[in-house]
Regions:
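Compact, glycine/acidic-enriched structural inserts
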Residues: 93-113
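Amphipathic protein-protein interaction modules
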Residues: 41-99
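N-terminal domain-onset segments
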Residues: 1-59
Length: 113
C-alpha cells in the first residue's frame, strides 16, 4: 500500500465538511461515501486539469494544475495535491480533458459533490 493510499484512508474519517440533508443518518451516509471511495480507489497516478469557474482560491481560471488521482468513477476524479495537503475533484470524460471547478476539501466532501 502506498503512502498516498494510507493518507486517503486516514482522511476518510473526516466528514466535517460534508453536507448532510435532514432525515439522513449522518454516520450511515458518511460510511457509504467512504466505502464508495474505497470501491473506486485506484493506484495513484498524476492527472492534470484546467481551473474553471467558479475557480479555486490561489489559482487563476485557465491555469493548469496537477495532482495524484486516488479514485475515479463516471467522469469524477478524486485528486490529492501534496503542496496544499488538500483533495480536489477534477471532472471530465477522459484524463486528457479535465476541469477543476472549485470542489476541494476532505475526500468525503469531494466525493459527495
Amino acid at each position: 500500500m502506498s503512502d498516498l493510499t494510507d493518507l486517503l484512508e486516514s482522511r476518510l474519517a473526516d466528514g466535517s465538511d460534508v453536507y448532510i440533508d435532514s432525515g439522513v443518518n449522518p454516520s450511515e451516509y458518511l460510511e457509504e461515501l467512504a466505502n464508495d471511495i474505497r470501491l473506486n480507489a485506484c493506484e495513484p497516478f498524476e492527472l492534470y486539469a484546467v481551473v474553471m469557474a467558479p475557480g479555486i482560491p490561489g489559482f487563476d481560471d485557465g491555469e493548469e494544475i496537477s495532482g495524484m488521482c486516488v479514485a475515479k468513477r463516471g467522469g469524477r476524479w478524486l485528486v490529492y495535491r501534496a503542496k496544499e495537503d488538500r483533495f480536489y475533484v477534477f471532472w471530465g470524460p477522459r484524463p486528457e480533458q479535465l476541469g477543476a471547478h472549485g470542489i476541494f476539501g476532505s475526500p468525503l466532501y469531494c466525493w459527495s459533490a
